Regions:
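Conserved phosphate-binding catalytic cores of ATP/NTP-utilizing and phosphoryl-transfer enzymes
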Residues: 1-10, 15-20, 25, 113-118, ...
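Active-site nucleophile and cofactor-binding loops and adjacent substrate-binding regions
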Residues: 7-11, 33-41, 103-105, 127, ...
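Conserved ATP-utilizing enzyme core subdomain
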Residues: 47, 57-91
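Adenine-nucleotide phosphate-binding core of ATP-dependent small-molecule kinases
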Residues: 83-114, 161
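Glycine-rich phosphate-binding loops at beta-strand->alpha-helix junctions
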Residues: 117-146, 157-161
């Protein structure tokens, strides 16, 4: 209930929901933003970057690489095609895949923050939801760093990949209970 912003990353989409306290003291949705038709900055983007590096995502291999990265290189998060043109020369130069995986996650966070917040302050606490964040804890760390959040300003629920489904079920339960 104390959440002020929800960041949800799935395989094909990215969402940011901003909450505020209304005059009655209740939490309500102030604004909601979702990415357009491009999958840049989503799980599909991470899948493409992993494929380019010759590693898997479902096995956790990409996450393991990113967690060991130490240097962030400039990679476009806006478009997978642009990102490939950034990463391929870095691969050819011999940049470690650990750093490239970390760089791709930084690109995802930049794209989400810049593309969805668009002038709205991201106030803590921030909850992180969706499968992309569930399976990439390093991505949550990157968001935390880019947003200058302390550990107590970050909420990662148990099973973040099903938070939306859980919320819908609770909402429907309340709706049907109040109509009887």
């Amino acid at each position: 209930p104390q959440t002020r912003c929800a960041i949800e990353l799935g395989g094909q989409d990215a969402k940011m929901i901003f909450f505020r306290t209304n005059d009655k003291g209740d939490i309500e949705v102030a604004d909601m933003r979702m990415n357009g038709s491009c999958a840049g900055g989503t799980g599909a983007f991470i899948d493409e970057m992993a494929k380019l590096m010759g590693v898997g995502t479902e096995s956790g291999e990409f996450e393991q690489l990113a967690s060991r990265g130490t240097t962030v290189h400039e990679v476009s998060g806006r478009c997978g095609v642009y990102a490939k043109t950034d990463i391929q020369p870095l691969l050819n130069e011999g940049i470690p895949t650990t750093d490239l995986a970390l760089s791709a996650l930084h690109a995802v966070a930049r794209q989400t923050i810049g593309g969805l917040a668009q002038g709205i302050d991201i106030e803590p606490p921030v909850i992180f939801e969706g499968g992309t964040l569930a399976y990439n804890p390093t991505l949550v760390r990157v968001f935390r760093e880019q947003l200058n959040l302390s550990d107590d300003q970050v909420i990662v629920p148990r099973d973040p990949q099903i938070m939306v489904a859980r919320g819908a079920a609770l909402s429907l339960t309340d709706m049907f209970a109040s109509s009887q």
